[in-house]
Amino acid sequence: MTENIRPPLPPFTAETAAQKVRAAENAWNTHDPEKIALAYTVDSQWRNRAQFLAGRDEIVQFLKQKWAKELDYRLIKELWAFHDARIAVRFAYEWHDDSGNWFRSYGNENWEYDQNGLMQRRIASINDSPIAEAERKFHWPPGPRPDDHPGLSEFGF
């Protein structure tokens, strides 16, 4: 089976790296694990916090569990750096648990892509910060962030 091709392809420019970051943000904001997993190689390697994953099946299961726990999830990613087939991003997302406790999670990701533009490695470090519901900043309807919505830098995050 041939893998799909997911432009833009490496080596990245500032413009194509930013496109990759926004595409990933938009996909994660759909909360569709099966669709999201298609952006990764079939044998993609992940470290998310202290959890290690291998392959699309584990990615799908991980994302299903994540969004069963992290409710009303809204994510913003921002390009930090890029070189050849690698991209570094910083991000923040807001969510609440089933008890109504709100959090803003801050983190950094390192991504490595194959020649088809599929992510083959994702390394994520994340910290959760409790917030009051009134402190929330990400209020758009479910789905991708509107183009005119502020990004991380505009919020000072």
Which residues fall in each region the model found?
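A beta-strand edge to alpha-helix "cap/lid" segment located at domain peripheries
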Residues: 2-12, 61-157
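Short, low-complexity N-terminal intrinsically disordered segments enriched in polar/charged residues
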Residues: 1-42, 153-157
